[in-house]
């Protein structure tokens, strides 16, 4: 972890034109879309996600069969099948001038 935290990202941001002041990204890992109403499931069990004014990626397919590997391949830039952990979704947002927070349970 110490080695990873010392690695610098390689992002080059050419333009940032944010439409909104605040962006919220919710990652519903370990959940099947057919069990959630907002994603086409049969139950009305996601009232907030079903009504929120946002972009929902309902057709995403996990990059791997395990959560850890799937998120590593999804949230990081991948070169030759290997995640570049320093070049990830959060470092890209930071490089673009956004403040970021990570909440996890």
What are these regions (language model features)?
Residues 1-25, 30-105:
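Active-site-proximal alpha/beta segments of enzymes that process anionic O-linked groups
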